[in-house]
Amino acid sequence: MAGHSQFKNIMHRKGRQDAMRSKIFSKLAREITVAAKQGAPDPAMNPRLRLAVQNAKAQSMPKDNIERAIKKASGNDVEHYDEVRYEGYGPGGVAVIVEALTDNRNRTASNVRAAFTKSGGALGETGSVSFMFHRIGEIIYKPAAGTADSIMDAAIEAGAEDVQSEETGHSITCAFENLGEVSKMLEAKLGEAESIKTVWKATTLAPVDEEKALSILRLISTLEEDDDVQNVYANFDVSDEILAKLSA
């Protein structure tokens, strides 16, 4: 099992859902505000904002919160956020990419570096691990959206590149630059997605044992709890046996 989506599910089952939900809304709002500030405040005229709003809706973010985040971009006192990417190695030599939106680069860099160091890893230079990943668009649908065959048909028609259907849902991937168009066509066929975003997909995987898997989980958790961190990606691969033990 590659990546860390299953680990996030494990963590959520162990509690803190409300706190995590609030933090997710805060990060979604920040992305909406930044997108609105960089372009037009109308999602129809701003591809990045349209995706941000679609993703917020998919996460059940209240409409008022979305509108407030858009309006905030036109205010005189709106914070200036920089988009920053950090790269490094976590436990077991696992490559990790961290994306952040921050109004204080020094604070965020210090927090991210501390998280890597505490886990036994090390923060590297930009480009030190991203060559092991490929930037793509990812659209997630819940299982009820359709059968594996119907999802595949819709994805092919929309111009997607790959589909993975499992018990937990359907993952549709496409070229990074086509995410807006593909997600729009899929919405017309399947309804609103559960998640729409660009992701770093690992092209090289690092197998890990149970001990290293737990260490990576702690690192990812620490990073994702930082208000400035938007996304975390890692190239670890864990066996189904270990995953089952962690899920117990």
Swiss-Prot record:
InterPro entries on file: Integrase-like_N, TACO1_YebC-like_2nd/3rd_dom, TACO1_YebC_N, Transcrip_reg_TACO1-like, Transcrip_reg_TACO1-like_dom3, YebC-like
Gene Ontology terms for molecular function: DNA binding
Broad class of where this protein is predominantly found: cytoplasm
Pfam families registered for this protein in UniProt: TACO1_YebC_N, Transcrip_reg
Keyword DNA-binding attributed: yes
GO BP, one annotated term: regulation of DNA-templated transcription
Keywords noted in UniProt: Cytoplasm, DNA-binding, Transcription, Transcription regulation
GO cellular component terms, semicolon-separated: cytosol
Compartmental location: Cytoplasm
Family statement: Belongs to the TACO1 family.
Record-given protein name: Probable transcriptional regulatory protein BQ11790
The species this protein was found in: Bartonella quintana (strain Toulouse)
